[in-house]
A protein has these predicted regions:
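P-loop NTPase motor domains
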Residues: 2-28, 32-332, 411, 416-450, ...
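Conserved ATP-driven motor cores of ASCE-family P-loop NTPases powering translocation/secretion/packaging/pilus
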Residues: 324-433
Length: 456
């Protein structure tokens, strides 16, 4: 009987809407659903012109809806701002503040068993630490060589300890033979951890281990001085940081949470070591962001989650750009906030930035003092037929009488002229989604209630 009533009800009012179509935000005349948010959101405004203000509204909407996620931090103030939003929505029980004071631990190798993935993780960390210093034609070659070193290093870790271990990797690399002559030195071989690992690898039936032993015996010691010096400086720089506090305690031992907690259990991780505070902060944010993106695309999930990238130019990585194309299919919303085009181009280059921004379906333009960014924003909004009014006045020869006339003309021009983005006040934005444009005001003290950007 109940089934019959349900069929009648469905025929009368239509099928139940998809959970992904639940309405979340009303931005003037634009309505954003869960699905809309997972299609990516870009917010771009000059320094101190309201990016964090507008972020509070969509963040609180997602928190209210039970989403979990990751919030990397660039500045100290972001930790307090994001934590305040989480507590305001009564989600403080779900907050994971990842820093040494909170005794948080996240061991990335608790869930990574593949040497290629481990090598990709440390390559991403080195990219963040070096801020993309290797660019141009040699960038891909250098990255390939770096991954080769790390992959062989982790292969030796596996054969020696039966697992991937950062501290062991640091010990092995530090004890490597620097020259072919040192490799043949009996004194170097005696009690040397790297030589012991090479011997274990040569005795095993593991092909990866055998290749790793050959690499550190025949290839690496004979590499050209410039390439070897660059690789050594990079690998040692990353491993040295991870071997010292606070990163040693944060990323080794038994984890207090997992990435699955963020995706499946609604937990929210705020990184308590800002990128700009130290190299430790830059590495901590890079590791968590890498692991979040990798876990995101491993399985389809019932729950929605988010990744907040405020001051995204400091957080963007190659791995993020690769995952952005597919991450929406896994119900993950990415929010990328930045100042202008120039700061992103400086980090990843113009072509990569164009590709990244092209994946953001919703674009929010705030007050902007960078001319090239204003021009770009106007071009994104497009052109259309614009009506212009002109007035002319005339007087008689004696000057006693005057007349005026108005003329309306149509011309093809920007829908939102570049100078319009310079005239916006703090909290005022122009929002572009597909071919729809809305002017939205975000309330600074009552996010989601005041202004025209509201939580549904």
């Amino acid at each position: 009987m109940n089934t019959l009533l349900e069929r009648i009800e469905s025929a009368l009012i239509g099928p139940e809407p998809s959970v992904s179509e639940r309405e979340m935000l009303q931005l003037s005349q634009l309505t954003l659903t869960r699905r809309s948010l997972t299609e990516g959101m870009l917010a771009i405004a000059s320094i101190g012109r309201g990016k964090t203000t507008l972020l509070r509204t969509p963040l609180r909407a997602m928190l209210r809806d039970g989403w979990g996620g990751l919030i990397p931090t660039v500045k100290d103030s972001m930790i307090a701002d994001m934590s305040e939003c989480i507590c305001a929505e009564s989600r403080d029980a779900d907050l994971i503040l990842f820093d040494d004071k909170a005794h948080s631990v996240f061991n990335p190798f608790a869930s990574i068993t593949d040497i290629n993935e481990a090598a990709a993780l440390l390559t991403g960390v080195s990219e963040a630490l070096n801020k993309g210093n290797h660019t141009g034609s040699d960038a891909s070659f250098w990255k390939q060589q770096l991954q080769l070193v790390l992959r062989h290093l982790f292969a030796l870790c596996q054969v020696q300890a039966g697992k991937l271990d950062l501290l062991l990797a640091a010990t092995l690399f530090d004890s490597r033979a620097k020259t072919p002559a040192e490799l043949q030195d009996p004194n170097w071989r005696t009690g040397n951890p790297m030589w012991a690992a090479i011997q274990s690898a040569r005795a095993s039936n593991d092909s990866d281990a055998g290749k790793a032993a050959h690499y550190f015996m025949e290839t690496f010691p004979h590499q050209s001085g410039g390439l070897q010096s660059s690789l050594v400086a990079t690998v040692e720089g990353v491993l040295d940081q991870l071997s010292r506090e606070p990163l040693r305690s944060l990323f080794s031992g038994e984890s207090t949470f997992s990435m699955r907690d963020l995706f499946d259990n609604g937990k929210i991780c705020v990184v308590g070591l800002p990128v700009l505070s130290s190299d430790s902060g830059r590495i901590a944010n890079a590791i968590l962001q890498f692991c979040f993106c990798r876990e995101a695309v491993k399985a389809k999930r019932d729950h929605h989650s988010f990744l907040i990238l405020d001051e995204g130019q400091e957080l963007v990585t190659t791995d993020l750009m690769e995952k952005m194309a597919v991450i929406r299919e896994f119900k993950v919303a990415v929010f990328f906030l930045t100042q202008n085009l120039s700061v992103v181009d400086q980090r990843i280059g113009q072509l990569a930035r164009e590709g990244l921004f092209g994946l953001m379906a919703t674009r929010i333009f705030g007050p902007q003092n960078h001319a090239a960014t204003r021009q770009w924003a106007a071009e994104q909004c497009g052109k259309g037929q614009q009506t212009a009014k002109s007035t002319s006045r005339s007087r008689s020869n004696r000057g006693s009488q005057s007349s005026s006339s108005e003329t309306l003309s149509s011309r093809w021009d920007y829908i939102c002229p570049p100078n319009q983005f310079a005239q916006l006040d703090i909290g005022e934005t122009i929002v572009l989604r597909n071919d729809e444009i809305a002017r939205v005001h975000w309330h600074p003290t009552h996010p989601g209630r005041g202004g025209s950007g509201r939580i549904i």
